[in-house]
């Protein structure tokens, strides 16, 4: 069904609001805003945020940038916490104690997803919980000082893999987490970029949220501090990432 993304943005309320403390030029806030806009207006959402840039900058008690329910979890626990929340919701719904439609969405950075939280993510996906896990991937542990993660590209310069005379940056290749999630035989897996093709991000978010069962979105979200670009260059950095095939637009449904 054809539609105009500009009309969607204009007519749907923002569930990720202004007033957060994310850095200027960060790719994560516009990605989170568009993902949350993919929800139907009448549906409620429970969001779990793993400790990281997005959580510490958008949910500082008593302030929040989220209009839906939000759970702050430890670095490694977003998928586990949300899977338990979803299971409790399903139980209460079967008992007739609640009737509203609630969607469950987890957000974690690449450090909390590729590395520290991979075990709980794999478990939640394998068990078949009806939830979406979103990895906002900026290629390193940016919140704690730009340390390398398994999402960091080979030869990238970080504080724990400094490019210089001894080593030319990170020596290991980047982990293909999207392919790992595909191997879990999920009903929907997608990869995209957070700030350039909003139509692609919106459509993939909508499919992930409204496909029954566990789904996964891997969204590249550049970081001006870690990547070293001027804050007004976010759009150009995203375009370069696509043009140079650093990130690819991919998605896979269970029947494909």
Language model features with spans:
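Gly/Ser/Thr-rich active-site loops/lids in small-molecule metabolic enzymes
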Residues: 235-249
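Short, well-ordered beta-to-alpha junction loops that form the rim of enzyme active sites
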Residues: 50-52, 219-222
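Conserved thiamine diphosphate
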Residues: 7-10, 99-100, 149-210
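Short, conserved beta-strand edge motifs with alternating hydrophobic and charged residues
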Residues: 135, 190-192, 216-220
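Conserved small/polar residues in nucleotide/adenosyl-binding loops
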Residues: 250-256
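Cofactor-binding active-site loop characterized by glycine-rich and histidine/acidic residues
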Residues: 2-133, 146-156, 170
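Short gly/pro/ser/thr-enriched loop/turn and capping motifs at secondary-structure boundaries
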Residues: 55, 138-143, 224-226
């Amino acid at each position: 069904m054809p539609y105009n993304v500009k009309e969607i943005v204009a007519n749907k309320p923002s569930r990720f609001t202004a007033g957060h403390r994310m850095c200027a030029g960060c790719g994560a806030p516009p990605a989170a805003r568009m993902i949350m806009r993919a929800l139907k207006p009448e549906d409620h959402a429970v969001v779990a945020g793993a400790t990281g840039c997005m959580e510490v900058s958008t949910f500082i008690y008593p302030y929040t940038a989220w209009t839906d329910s939000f759970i702050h979890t430890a670095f490694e626990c977003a998928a586990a916490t949300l899977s338990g929340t979803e299971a409790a919701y399903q139980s209460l719904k079967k008992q007739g104690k609640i009737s509203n439609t609630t969607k469950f969405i987890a957000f974690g950075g690449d450090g909390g997803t590729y590395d520290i939280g991979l075990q709980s993510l794999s478990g939640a996906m394998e068990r078949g919980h009806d939830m979406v896990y979103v990895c906002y991937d900026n290629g390193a542990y940016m919140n704690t000082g730009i340390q390398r993660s398994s999402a960091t590209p080979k030869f990238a310069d970080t504080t724990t893999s400094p490019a210089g005379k001894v080593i030319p940056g990170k020596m290991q290749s980047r982990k293909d987490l999207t392919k790992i999630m595909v191997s879990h035989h999920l009903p929907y897996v997608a990869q995209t970029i957070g700030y350039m093709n909003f139509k692609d991000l919106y459509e993939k978010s909508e499919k992930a949220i409204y496909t029954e069962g566990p789904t996964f979105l891997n969204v590249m979200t550049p970081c001006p501090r870690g990547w070293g670009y001027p804050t007004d260059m976010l759009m150009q950095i995203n375009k370069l990432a696509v043009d140079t095939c650093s990130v690819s637009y991919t998605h896979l449904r269970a029947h494909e």
